[in-house]
Amino acid sequence: EGEDFDQDGKDDTGLNDGMSYSINYSLDNLYLAIAGDQDIDNQDLLRMVAQYQMDALKLGFMYQQNEDNLGTKDESGYFFSAAYKIDGNVTLKAQYGAIEDDVDGDEEKTMSIGADYKLGKNTKVFAFYTDNTDSAIDSDDSEFSAVGLGMEHKF
């Protein structure tokens, strides 16, 4: 027997109670999407995305709302991104985002910069630096950074 988290008299934890959806629209250089989950792993998620390309510059935005059905988490957040293709092989990238727990006000912020270098039609190498701050952590670990290097090959 399942649980009735929202007290509507219905089992909210069965395998057939979850739903995912996605709608997207694309026209020329504009891309829009909305996607979400209802009652998947006891969470409801809504995500909206917009992206626009102007010649060598690509701009992006994402908004997300996430609630769990147990009442312990209610988060909302956003991300801005930009990518600029310098020439046929190099793309510079930047991203900034923040997510806030609407229950207790804790906020996490992230900023990333990086670059891709195209080695061939299906292969690129990339590098990035990310800086994160989390107000929920009351210690020296509330700020942390990461550096990444990698290679991607598409078959």
Model-identified regions with their sequence ranges:
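Outer-membrane beta-barrel proteins
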Residues: 1-155
